[in-house]
Design a protein with these regions (language model features):
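N-terminal small/glycine-rich loop or linker at the start of catalytic domains
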Residues: 169-177, 264-268, 273-275, 285-298, ...
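Glycine-rich tight-turn/loop motif centered on a GG-T
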Residues: 225, 229-233, 276-305, 365-381
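Conserved, well-structured core domains of diverse proteins
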Residues: 2-206, 210-220, 225-237, 241-266, ...
Length: 408
C-alpha cells in the first residue's frame, strides 16, 4: 500500500476498501452458498445488498461523503441521527442542555402523571454558580385564602377601568395559562388535549393565530382568541379585517379575551406561511381561507399602521366584542417603538387590558435560524422595559402584563 498516494498499489483508493471487501465477500459467499447451501445464502445476500448500496453511493451527486466513502459513509449519518439520544442518555447532566434540562423535563413528567415530585436531603444545584436564581421569603408568612391564583383583567365587575372604550366584561384569569399554538401547527388531538386541560385546570387556552377550530370548542375550555396579521377567522376574501366575522367569533361565550399579536418572539417581524398541502378543509374552515392554497401571514397588519391607529383598533375590537378584554402580544424590538405605543395610549386614553411580552427565546413551528437566535429582546429584559415604562407613565394599574417564552 502506498501511503503517499492513499491507494492499494495499482488497484483502488483506500477509501473504497469497504466497498471492495463487500464485493469480494459477495462473490466468495456466493461460491460458499452454492457449495454448502443453507444459511450460507445470507452472506451473499447481505454483502450483495451492501455492494449495491455502494455502487449507488458512487453514482449519486447529493452527498460528497457517500461518493468518497461508499457504504462506510452511511455511518456518519447514522451517528448524526442517534447523537441527541446518546447525549441525553449518557452524556448530559441533570441541569444542563437547552431548551430544558433533564431535571426540568423530569419534573414536568412527574407532575403530569401525578407522581410525587418531592426530594430528600436538599438542592443538587450549585448555589454559588453564575446565573443561580432564588426567591426571597418572608419571616412572617401568611395563610393563603385560596390556592387558585387568579387576577382580574379589564377591571373588576362593577368597577370598570378609567379611559375610553373600556372593558365591560372583565375576566378572572389564572396566572398560568396555555400559550399560543395554532391548529394547523398542532394536530387536532393536541388541541383537544390542551383545551381539556384548560377546562379541567381552570385556566385559559390561547388559540394561536390559526383562529378557533371545532376542536377548540369541543371541551368548552376558556379561550383567548389570538388575531394576527392574517386576520384568520375574521377576514374578508382579500385578507383584510372583517367586522362582521369578528363579531361572530368574539361574542362566543367561550371566548373570554382577544389577543392582538403584533410580533412573535421566535421570529419577530417575519410573518409566516402554512403550505397549501397542509391547508385541509378543517383548517380552511377555521381560518376562513381556500382549501389547498398557501396560507400567508404578512409581517405587518393592514388594519393599522401607526401607534395611534393601533389604539383606536384596540378600542374598536373591544366595542365589537361586546366589551371583552382586548390585549396585545409583542416581542420588544426597538425601545422607541414601544415608547411610541405608550405615548399613543396617553394621547387617546385607550389602553390594552393586557400586554403579553414574548421573549426572543420563545418557540414556533418554523422560523429562519437567524431570527430564532438573534432577533428580538429576551423575555427578562423585555418584561423589565414594559413594566418600568408603564409605571413611569402611571398606566401600570390599568394594564396586566403576561409573559411567554419557555416558561416552566
Amino acid at each position: 500500500m502506498s501511503a503517499a498516494s492513499g491507494r492499494f498499489p495499482g488497484l483502488f483508493p483506500i477509501r473504497y476498501t469497504v466497498l471492495v471487501l463487500c464485493a469480494v465477500g459477495t462473490i466468495t459467499g456466493l461460491g460458499a452458498a452454492l457449495a454448502w447451501g443453507g444459511w450460507w445464502w445470507l452472506l451473499p445476500l447481505v454483502l450483495g445488498a451492501l455492494s449495491a448500496v455502494g455502487v449507488q453511493d458512487l453514482r449519486q451527486t447529493r452527498h460528497a461523503v457517500l461518493r468518497n466513502y461508499p457504504v462506510i459513509g452511511h455511518m456518519r449519518f447514522m451517528l448524526e441521527f442517534i447523537r441527541p439520544e446518546i447525549r441525553q442518555y449518557f452524556i448530559e447532566g441533570d441541569h444542563e442542555n437547552l431548551p430544558f434540562s433533564r431535571a426540568q423535563r423530569s419534573l414536568v413528567y412527574q407532575r403530569s402523571k401525578g407522581v410525587s415530585d418531592s426530594r430528600p436531603f436538599g438542592t443538587l444545584l450549585d448555589v454559588s454558580a453564575p446565573g443561580y436564581e432564588w426567591v426571597n421569603h418572608s419571616m412572617v408568612p401568611t395563610k393563603l385564602a385560596s390556592q387558585d391564583f387568579r387576577t382580574w383583567i379589564g377591571g373588576t365587575p362593577g368597577q370598570p377601568l378609567p379611559g375610553v372604550d373600556v372593558c365591560t366584561q372583565p375576566y378572572h384569569a389564572s396566572v398560568f395559562n396555555i400559550s399560543a399554538m395554532s391548529f394547523g401547527a398542532l394536530s387536532a388531538n393536541a388541541v383537544l388535549a390542551l383545551n381539556l386541560g384548560a377546562r379541567t385546570g381552570g385556566f385559559a387556552h390561547d388559540t394561536g393565530e390559526g383562529s378557533i377550530s371545532k376542536y377548540h370548542r369541543e371541551h368548552g375550555g376558556d379561550l383567548i382568541w389570538q388575531i394576527a396579521s392574517g386576520y384568520f377567522g375574521c377576514r374578508n376574501p382579500d385578507g383584510t379585517f372583517s367586522d362582521e366575522k369578528f363579531v361572530e367569533n368574539a361574542r362566543d361565550p367561550q371566548v373570554k379575551m382577544i389577543e392582538l399579536k403584533l410580533s412573535q418572539g421566535a421570529k419577530p417581524g417575519h410573518g409566516g406561511m402554512l403550505l397549501g398541502a397542509k391547508v385541509t378543509p378543517e383548517i380552511a374552515a377555521a381560518r376562513g381561507i381556500p382549501v389547498g392554497q398557501d396560507c400567508i401571514s404578512p409581517p405587518f397588519h393592514s388594519a393599522f399602521s401607526t401607534p395611534l391607529e393601533l389604539m383606536h383598533f384596540i378600542g374598536r375590537l373591544r366595542r365589537l366584542s361586546g366589551g371583552k378584554p382586548v390585549g396585545i402580544k409583542l416581542c420588544i424590538g426597538h425601545p422607541w417603538e414601544w415608547f411610541a405605543m405608550v405615548k399613543a395610549m396617553l394621547e387617546t386614553d385607550i389602553t390594552p387590558d393586557f400586554i403579553v411580552v414574548d421573549g426572543a427565546e420563545g418557540g414556533t413551528g418554523a422560523a429562519p435560524v437567524e431570527f430564532t437566535d438573534h432577533v428580538g429582546v429576551p423575555l427578562q429584559e423585555g418584561l423589565i422595559l414594559v413594566h418600568n415604562t408603564l409605571v413611569g407613565v402611571k398606566l401600570r394599574d390599568r394594564i396586566k402584563i403576561g409573559a411567554a417564552a419557555k416558561v416552566i
